Amino acid sequence: MILDQYYAQPKCSPSRAALMTGLYPYKMSLQRGAIGDFRPMGLPTVIKTLPEMLRSAGYSTHLVGKWHLGYCHPDYTPIRRGFDTFYGMMSQQSDHYTREQAVNKYMGSGYDHWRDGNVTYEGAGLYSTNLWEEETVRLVNSRNSSTPWFIELSLTAAHSPFQVPERFSDIYRAGRSRPTGSKEEVSAWENGILRRGMVTAIDESVGRIMEALRASGQHDNTLVVFSSDNGSGMKEGNKPLRGKKGEIFEGGVRVPAFVTGSPLVKNTKRTSPGFKR
């Protein structure tokens, strides 16, 4: 079931907060933007989260990938917010191969990769999308009971920095000439190539996860929800929509989304968002 008029928030953390709580971000004082590095704030601990509700209902709960809802105190971190396991990063972005943040070059610190409540160096050098995919497939394949489960896979691509294995970016370089204009024009062209490759890498990894669900016999009893937290930060990546990430034009908030996998979405039909005359 494709949701072709699905709206998120203009920035990462507000969208994640809404997904985790079912509340508008302004009700949690998180409407203004992303929770940046070293910020003494996070998703309010007095508000019950989706994984907490599911765990109360008997689900096992797992987070793979990006958290980005605060880590200034252990009470704000995933393991304290309803997840039984966490494998990923706490903050907004890091190098897709080294897990180091941009602050590393200024402060001599900034490594961001966690297994539950401890720093881990697993998967050193592995591209982030493949790293999160492997962990998700492992969780799917390791399920050996009738206990229902919830996995939030929060991929760090296609967020900057723009990095991807060459076999993906080469798809979009073929037959295209590198521009010879200004430094900004060349950079925008290169970033566009890389970002397209990053999305293709995501597509491949999501496909492998879906195959793992089918192979394990869990696909038809699993509700899969795909969403994005905001529009592209590059305006040309949102065409024909106006605007970009951080703006309330449709280019910043209207994002891809679909639901699949469960009997709930079989035999669906398309409805038009238009008005009848």
Feature annotation, model-predicted:
Residues 1-277:
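Formylglycine-dependent sulfatase
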